């Protein structure tokens, strides 16, 4: 199989991923688990108290795979974000269905952590039209959103997770950032 490069943007920075096959993309959770577990412990619980009991509500993670809808773009490097979400959803038994916010969407639990998966059905450069309102609806701060997209600047054959960085001049992630700040979700 051809090598595929991708970036996963989130938590105030950029996580860059490179995967060599669809099977490896299916193991996305394994690669992200240490990062998410660390962030999960410090930022993900909201305490609810009442006179008789208290409980914690675990805030979900939103994983977004950027790509372009339509057969014309299937199996192209530009849709690696879609491929990553598809493989992750399949490996975790999460079904994706149409969502009112212009996305294919799924919800599930992975190792006790709630996850939301989204594939915006807008063109990539307009992905913020889907992701911004979706994150706002679920009241997710930006540090609970990870966005996977192709990255032509990444060399093939390298895997790098980086909690801080930029968006790699990627218009889809720029649109996402602008929409999120306009929705005041951070």
From Swiss-Prot:
Residues involved in tRNA binding: 73, 123, 125, 171
Disulfide-bond pairs as recorded: none
GO CC annotation terms, alphabetical: chloroplast
Transit peptide: 1-49
Main location: plastid
Superkingdom of the source species: Eukaryota
Transmembrane regions listed in the UniProt entry: none
Residues under site feature: Stabilizes the basic form of H active site to accept a proton: 150
Active site (UniProt): 78 (proton acceptor)
Keywords attached to this entry: Chloroplast, Plastid, RNA-binding, Transit peptide, tRNA-binding
Gene Ontology MF terms: peptidyl-tRNA hydrolase activity; tRNA binding
Classification via Pfam families: Pept_tRNA_hydro
Subcellular locations according to the entry: Plastid, Chloroplast
Family: Belongs to the PTH family.
Protein name, per record: CRS2-like protein, chloroplastic
Lineage of the organism: Eukaryota, Viridiplantae, Streptophyta, Embryophyta, Tracheophyta
